[in-house]
Amino acid sequence: MRTKEAVAARILELCKEKNIAINTLANTSGIAPSTIYSMLNEKSKNPGIVSIKKICDGLGTTVRVFFDCELFDDTEQEMR
């Protein structure tokens, strides 16, 4: 799995776990809905750590918790 796929899957997983809609997440995190949808649809080439931190804040979690899951254990090395 590529890193952006893992990020998208983790965002969806946490939204489902916390019963938060994507538009609600956008409002609470201060990120435009289009930016979050770009991350979820893997159109965002490189979801930045600042955006991920804002999403974590909107989800009421930490960056450590966000990345501490099996989705990120076997991500592929990505070459440009």
Residue ranges and their predicted role:
Residues C15, A26, C56:
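The alpha-helix within a helix-turn-helix
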Residues K43-D57:
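Short, basic-rich loop-to-helix N-cap that marks the start of a DNA-contacting helix
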Residues M1-A21:
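A short, Lys/Arg-rich alpha-helix, primarily the initiator
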Residues S38, R64-R80:
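Short, charged recognition helix plus adjacent turn
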Residues T24, T35, V65:
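Residues in the helix-turn-helix
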Residues G30-N46:
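Recognition helix of helix-turn-helix/homeodomain-like DNA-binding domains
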